UniProtKB/Swiss-Prot annotation:
CC per GO annotation: cytosolic large ribosomal subunit
Localization per record: Cytoplasm
Covalent cross-link Glycyl lysine isopeptide (Lys-Gly) (interchain with G-Cter in ubiquitin), where: 188
Gene: RPL10
Subunit architecture: Component of the large ribosomal subunit. Mature ribosomes consist of a small (40S) and a large (60S) subunit. The 40S subunit contains about 33 different proteins and 1 molecule of RNA (18S). The 60S subunit contains about 49 different proteins and 3 molecules of RNA (28S, 5.8S and 5S).
Keywords: Citrullination, Cytoplasm, Developmental protein, Isopeptide bond, Ribonucleoprotein, Ribosomal protein, Ubl conjugation
Any GO BP annotation: regulation of translation
The protein's name in its UniProt record: Large ribosomal subunit protein uL16
Superkingdom, natural source: Eukaryota
Length: 214
């Protein structure tokens, strides 16, 4: 018997059921890589950020996440070059789905018990997503805005339900507005740290603040 279609597991009906010592024998998720492109690009290299945002409360299978990741990556590599972007899949499939296998061969009615003992065996994993939750983000240079929108639009077709594409007002993957970001870096209130930044508050020892601004 093959894998059951993902439409059977689309809705969030039950409580989260993660892999644990009580829920064993869970097959590995199809998606293993969540960051691709130029992951180590400094925060000031990729100011533009686009998000794919879910418009439904549903479950997305690990196979669908992997298909969307491959689709977006292939388009971005073709249009921006392999070092011109950074894609991050923001969902992780932790919820385990089950299947109560039924025999469909001749004489199966003598072997199986129908709905007696119907708690199934683990079949795969899905990610539970809420309305307004980000599924996938891409950061890149400002001139690649159309390519980001097109890559996310193509990746949308791999998912059920409805998603929206949103170009963020923030700088890259940070939580600071793009129009304030460069001023805050110049004032040394933000220190670039990989693909993120460290925020330096105006509190703390005065000599530490003087050493930073000297």
């Amino acid at each position: 018997m093959g894998r059951r279609p993902a439409r059977c597991y689309r809705y969030c009906k039950n409580k989260p059921y993660p892999k644990s010592r009580f829920c064993r024998g869970v097959p590995d998720a199809k998606i293993r890589i969540f960051d691709l492109g130029r992951k180590k690009a400094k925060v000031d290299e990729f100011p533009l950020c686009g998000h794919m945002v879910s418009d439904e409360y549903e479950q997305l299978s690990s196979e669908a996440l992997e298909a969307a990741r491959i689709c977006a990556n292939k388009y971005m590599v073709k249009s921006c070059g392999k070092d011109g972007f950074h894609i991050r899949v923001r969902l992780h499939p932790f919820h385990v789905i089950r299947i109560n296998k039924m025999l469909s061969c001749a004489g199966a009615d003598r072997l199986q018990t129908g709905m007696r003992g119907a708690f199934g065996k683990p079949q795969g994993t899905v990610a539970r997503v809420h309305i307004g939750q980000v599924i996938m983000s891409i950061r890149t240079k400002l001139q690649n805005k159309e390519h980001v929108v097109e890559a996310l639009r193509r990746a949308k077709f791999k998912f059920p339900g409805r998603q929206k594409i949103h170009i963020s007002k923030k700088w890259g993957f940070t939580k600071f507005n793009a129009d304030e970001f460069e001023d805050m870096v110049a004032e040394k209130r933000l220190i670039p740290d990989g693909c993120g930044v460290k925020y330096i508050p105006n509190r703390g020892p005065l000599d530490k603040w003087r050493a930073l601004h000297s």
